[in-house]
Amino acid sequence: MAGRTPRSVATRLGELDCRVVDALPEGATPELAVVLCHGFGAPATDLVPLAPELLALEGALAERVRFVFPGAPLTLAELGMPSGRAWFHLPPEVLMGQARDWSRFGREVPPGIAAARRGVMSVVDALSTATKLPYGRIVLGGFSQGGMVTTDVALRLEEAPAGLCILSGTLTSEAEWRQKASARKGLPVFQAHGRHDDVLPFSAAERLRDLLVEAGLSVDFHPFEGPHTIAPEELERLAAFLVARLGGR
């Protein structure tokens, strides 16, 4: 990484508190920004350790990319998770691990996702203003619920982002996403999901993949043998995906 240690700075972008990580020279402007949103129940900084790992995997990222990790706006203290955050609340049956109708979940628009979308959009707008990067030079992504929100945002921004990274995410808001995705033909998407995911089933991830592919998005789908997690080989593929975004589509 050109001998520079990544620095991590807490700041507020738009409506959300964020952690910003890069290894750029002091005062340098990034050529690409990557916004990654954590999952339901995780602390706001849960994904921050991914930045130095990705920077170490690909030297080009260290020289040219800035990572931004927004914290979700909702607290889960009332559920016994004082440091847990959420982008939107989940139905009680999901929280209790009861049988879930994932086909129905895929069709429904989750209450609260619109507010979560506005929050992430405010981060993207503030980041674009601060770095002078157009939306087309900002990659969006997230893990689990964070992947749902950033998929929703990527399909609704006025301008297409540089790419979308869905890490163990799932399908929701199906009718709206299908309609919006038709305007995102060619958008590069990296999607990874564990075959043994017992939180968000692999079959639902396949339905999301199929929706995006049918709409003409360029999806790199990476299944791995594992549960609801981020696998080492997934990180390697993600790093390569981000390097490709440096060169444009």
Residue ranges and their predicted role:
Residues 49, 152-156:
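Active-site signature of alpha/beta-hydrolase-fold catalytic machinery across serine-
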Residues 10-23, 28-133:
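Serine-hydrolase catalytic machinery in alpha/beta-hydrolase-like enzymes
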Residues 49-51, 177, 201-211:
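Short alpha-helix in the alpha/beta-hydrolase fold that links the catalytic acid
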Residues 142-146, 150:
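Gly/Ala-rich beta-loop-alpha elbow adjacent to hydrolase catalytic centers
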Residues 203-249:
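C-terminal catalytic histidine-bearing segment of alpha/beta-hydrolase fold enzymes
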Residues 159-171:
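A conserved short beta-strand
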